[in-house]
Amino acid sequence: MFAVIKTGGKQYRVEPGMLLKVEKLPADVGETVEIEASLIKDDQGNIKTEGKVEAEVVEHGKHKKVLVFHFKRKKNYKKLNGHRQPYTLIKIKDIKA
């Protein structure tokens, strides 16, 4: 059984027991969150277009640093910026059709 969920402007294919990094969610560690599923396919091959996915928040963190370098030739202009995107690690517990 698997489902397709949409969170943080992205879509993910998830299965029960799977760990997944998504954009930061407003939930505390240990809380259970419900995410809308846009597509669910069960073990018999039946497809449903509505449902919910139950997930547990495992941790909050930041991804690796991404460096952004701005440069203008002949003007001695150099600028280096870094960015670390926050994420939430969730564990998929159950898929409800």
From Swiss-Prot:
Entry keywords, A to Z: Ribonucleoprotein, Ribosomal protein, RNA-binding, rRNA-binding
Subunit details: Part of the 50S ribosomal subunit. Contacts protein L20.
NCBIfam families reported for this sequence: L21
Ribonucleoprotein recorded as keyword: yes
GO cellular component annotations of the record: cytoplasm; ribonucleoprotein complex; ribosome
GO terms of molecular function: rRNA binding; structural constituent of ribosome
Recorded name of the encoding gene: rplU
Name of the molecule in the record: Large ribosomal subunit protein bL21
UniProt xrefs under InterPro entries: bL21-like, bL21-like_sf, Ribosomal_bL21
